[in-house]
A protein has these predicted regions:
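Conserved, structured core segments of small domains
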Residues: 1-123
Length: 123
């Protein structure tokens, strides 16, 4: 099952973990076949939030909500179950300084013909 491990850190701790330590963690997970993707994010000040309300788009600088910890990166992993995903998350280096939110992903289940109709109507 796929799990998204969201890395949260306070701004003052964004550089508490050396890039090489995170890369070593990712390489180990990749070699084990458990890592599907991983990326660090730029600071929250570079975020842009997009909203569609009543058919109108608004774009604002910054994140959706103010928070002490900010989303600093993610690891998309393939684990047997939540327990294994938690064990993997505990080994992600920034866990020592912030938090790792572990969330299962879900598959989108739709009829392919319905997707084609929707895509045709949108273009």
């Amino acid at each position: 099952m796929k799990y998204l491990c969201l890395v949260y850190l306070e701004a003052s701790k964004l550089h508490a973990v050396a890039d090489r330590e995170c890369m070593a963690c990712g390489d180990g997970l990749r070699h084990s076949g458990m890592l599907l993707a991983a990326e660090p994010l730029h600071p929250v000040e570079t975020a842009t939030t997009v909203r569609i309300r009543n058919g109108a788009m608004t774009v604002t600088d910054g994140p959706f909500a103010e928070t002490k910890e900010q989303l600093a990166g993610f690891y998309l992993i393939d684990a047997r179950d939540l327990n294994e995903a938690i064990q993997i998350a505990a080994k992600i280096p920034p866990a020592k300084y912030g938090s790792i939110e572990v969330r299962p992903t879900r598959e989108l289940v739709v009829d392919p013909a319905e997707v084609e109709r929707y895509a045709a109507a949108a273009s």
